[in-house]
């Protein structure tokens, strides 16, 4: 096995900084790749939380003026991850999350902030750190999308490049005037460069210039080549279809392990699901639901948004109530959806419970105690909650899109091999019909237990997924040597 060195570039990395699924991937993949002979180091910005955790990091480069202020490149490690940190206080030492202010407004200089990250990634690719010269630079999402562009326009020997799309909806769009401020040539403002409907797009830059493009499920890789799914970039992705592949995400099975999970009331394993009923009782109590073994308890852990289909679930509430089901929802997002769910809970005490926000303990308890987990997304690049549900014996009810299509086996298609229920088209009526079907199956205890056991037997770890990435890296390295 030929060793490979890969520099990953990500704006967030779990367990250091997390706002979404990107962080989970960036935190889990490097560790899983070690078994495949891949040495991965991850470059991330020096946000306040990062600097606190890596207070003993080694300084390996200092700049008196890096994109408008002093900066340093640090090397350190945390929780099994080997890290490079770009410490540029005037860009990253701020309150709020990595992308927005405490009021939820995008930082006005986000273009410069993440161009700086990509610039140093390209420099590491060129040998800035002699002890680690990567074979490949792997950029994650728009925040790292300029790394392949810088490497292209530097016009010198370079490593291979991979661009991963975690969500096409986030494209890093800015005014063209930014080009002059971030050190790219004006020739890059071209339809075959960064130009995007009169502005520039960091995501487009990555898709245009990366040697290989991946996204987080095979179905999503097909969907984003359409005009609708590509959200303005479908034509480019069709043109680059030969470089595009879909590799499913996994989950950290050490964190999501019902046998050792300290967040749940009663631990259990695949061979004995008895304690799931005890967790269900605790979950009902936490969400002020009626205590009942016979009422199917539906769980939801989601951002409340149009993309996630949470408006469709609201329309299906009469079906939930009519079928004698319960609903426990944990999430936040669109203010109107929050208000409507809270109103539904007030109108149906004991049947619908809602907690606005995110709570890690409650998220684990929902997986361990709900009978089914609903993921009704209009589009879903991969999805992680349904993978956790399989791991915990909560039967997924999902829409037929993206990674949901790829990770759940529908009861109507596979019988005894099934792991859940899928519905399409993505409408409230289709969801309601599938909820009725799930309710019927729930009351057939043998059928339901088979669904749970099939889910628990499904490999949702990063083990096989990491092998796919390792094969991609080696294929790219070999093609560049040829």
Swiss-Prot record:
It catalyses: [(1->4)-alpha-D-glucosyl](n) + ADP-alpha-D-glucose = [(1->4)-alpha-D-glucosyl](n+1) + ADP + H(+). InterPro entries: Glyco_trans_1, GS/SS, Starch_synth_cat_dom. Keywords: Glycogen biosynthesis, Glycosyltransferase, Transferase. Its EC number is 2.4.1.21. GO terms for biological process: glycogen biosynthetic process. GO terms for cellular component: cytosol. It is an enzyme of class 2 (transferase). Belongs to the glycosyltransferase 1 family. Bacterial/plant glycogen synthase subfamily. Synthesizes alpha-1,4-glucan chains using ADP-glucose. This is Glycogen synthase 2. It comes from Bradyrhizobium diazoefficiens (strain JCM 10833 / BCRC 13528 / IAM 13628 / NBRC 14792 / USDA 110).
